[in-house]
């Protein structure tokens, strides 16, 4: 039956609906023939995993499950809750505790966040750029009146601590958008909330209020007059068609369900900006000829929502990932202001850091750095890409690359929440250029990874790279053309 299901799915569904983007997962690759006893022992498990992923129709089955769970009033996914009014709430335990006040900043966490803000501010000031930090409140904060009493705030939240204590320690300008958006929620009407009922972001009216508040804050810091942006009663508010404007429909495989219709919110004559460029990891909004303030938003998913109204105040707004702040980015965008924009729940984890150039360490420098975690070097935990072949040997994991520079091997390392040193001990049979790539922040794949190239000589080589990302996602990709080496050790070291 399982064999027939795969064939039947291939015949019944159009190719577009079987594409990896529709299935929301990378296409599975069939495991190659093992070359060692450990590989043969792991083969049944790898075949079972590949076979289960090869069966199509996951989005239909998972979508049916979502509809059933919502109908029963049960959580459709982990940390996602539905209430009787049909609203969806994303409330991970760490974010809930930080917002409720039961998990406040301790001295160490406060120091980490203050240090990150201070580093960002100093980097910007060195380039003649003013720096600010903007906290976008969680939907659960702004619409707290719609939540159950047992989820109410008890003590000062991390957001409130951040606004006062962390900002003072870092000597940085911080804007908390919660008071303005809580006030805006008092103007809600049926079908016109400040945050999407079925998503996590602001509606167009919520974006307007956040943009006005941010523009007014920047003008006040500059000592400039209050910006003239559209008032609430001046907004152009045509109804938007029922769509997945900002819903969990995609993540829950429920396209066609979870539709929401809200009024738009735009200036009376329409927006004056144009989207000058949009590429992976960066968007550029330009008003008129681009003259006026330049603002760089190192922002999470709230950034583009905020940029639409900031671009009515500034001449140019560039939106980049929160972890992408670097000297190079400041030099290429040449902003007057750099704003870190993060959602409130991020305060429960790690601060956005400054992306510094990768530093190669000498082997003698590693003695003082304690080991934090090691990779398991066997074919069951590593993954070959392209024509690369991997095999377990007595001294480590053998990797033989093909002729493509994209051939490589993915080593599974535990995630890291702080900057770390990646250490690779290699025995090189065939030398060449090795590209080491890693993921930082929330990137789901290797499309926007960072990388660093090193030249491998024949014989023993130790590669030690200090990586500045605050959130290292673990997996490391080693790629190159025609390389042949043995990985004897792959580990994270603590940065002192």
Segments and roles (model prediction):
Residues 410-412, 461-468:
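Exposed aromatic-hydrophobic patches
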Residues 421-427, 464-466, 477-479, 491:
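Residues within well-ordered beta-strands of beta-sheet-rich folds
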Residues 429-431:
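Acidic, Ser/Thr/Pro
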Residues 450-454:
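Solvent-exposed beta-strand/loop surfaces of large extracellular or lumenal domains
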Residues 1-398, 407, 417-419, 424, ...:
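Extracellular glycan-modifying ectodomains
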């Amino acid at each position: 039956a399982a064999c027939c299901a795969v064939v039947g799915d291939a015949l019944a569904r159009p190719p577009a609906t079987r594409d990896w983007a529709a299935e929301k997962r990378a296409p599975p690759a069939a495991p190659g023939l093992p070359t060692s006893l450990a590989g043969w022992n792991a083969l049944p498990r790898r075949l079972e995993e590949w076979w289960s992923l090869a069966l199509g129709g996951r989005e239909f089955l998972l979508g049916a499950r979502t509809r059933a769970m919502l109908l029963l009033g049960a959580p459709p996914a982990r940390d996602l809750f539905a209430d009787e009014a049909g609203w969806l709430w994303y409330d991970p335990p760490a974010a809930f505790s930080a917002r409720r006040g039961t998990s406040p900043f301790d001295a160490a966490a406060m120091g980490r966040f203050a240090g990150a803000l201070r580093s960002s501010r100093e980097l910007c000031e060195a380039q003649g750029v003013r720096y600010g930090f903007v906290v976008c409140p969680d939907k659960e904060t702004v619409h707290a009146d719609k939540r159950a009493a047992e989820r109410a705030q008890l003590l000062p939240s991390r957001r409130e601590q951040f606004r006062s204590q962390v900002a003072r320690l870092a000597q940085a300008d911080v804007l908390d958008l919660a008071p303005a958006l809580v006030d805006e929620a008092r103007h809600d009407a049926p079908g016109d909330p400040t945050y999407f009922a079925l998503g996590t972001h602001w509606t167009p009216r919520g974006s307007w209020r956040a943009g006005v508040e941010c523009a007014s804050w920047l003008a006040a810091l500059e000592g400039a007059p209050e910006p003239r942006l559209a008032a609430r009663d001046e907004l152009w508010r045509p109804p938007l068609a029922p769509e997945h404007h900002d819903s969990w429909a995609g993540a829950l495989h429920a396209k066609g369900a979870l539709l929401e219709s809200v009024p738009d919110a735009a200036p009376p004559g329409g927006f004056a900006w144009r989207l000058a460029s949009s590429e992976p990891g960066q968007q550029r909004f330009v008003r008129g000829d681009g003259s006026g303030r330049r603002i760089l938003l190192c922002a999470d998913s709230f950034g583009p929502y905020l940029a639409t109204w900031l671009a009515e105040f500034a001449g140019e707004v560039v939106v980049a990932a929160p972890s992408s702040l670097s000297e190079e980015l400041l030099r290429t965008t040449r902003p007057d202001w750099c704003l870190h924009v993060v959602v409130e729940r991020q305060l429960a984890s790690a601060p956005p850091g400054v992306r510094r150039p990768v530093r190669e360490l000498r082997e003698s420098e590693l003695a003082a750095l304690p080991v934090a975690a090691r990779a398991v070097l066997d074919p069951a935990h590593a993954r070959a890409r392209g024509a690369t072949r991997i095999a377990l040997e007595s001294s480590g994991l053998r990797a033989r690359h093909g002729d493509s520079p994209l051939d490589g091997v993915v080593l599974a390392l535990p995630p890291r929440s702080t900057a770390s040193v990646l250490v690779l001990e290699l025995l090189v049979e065939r030398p060449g250029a090795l590209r080491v790539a890693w993921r930082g922040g929330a990137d789901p794949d290797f499309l926007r990874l960072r990388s660093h190239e090193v030249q491998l000589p024949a014989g023993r080589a130790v590669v030690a790279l200090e990586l500045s990302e605050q959130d290292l996602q673990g997996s490391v990709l080693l790629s190159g053309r025609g390389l042949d080496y043995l990985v004897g050790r792959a580990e994270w070291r603590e940065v002192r």
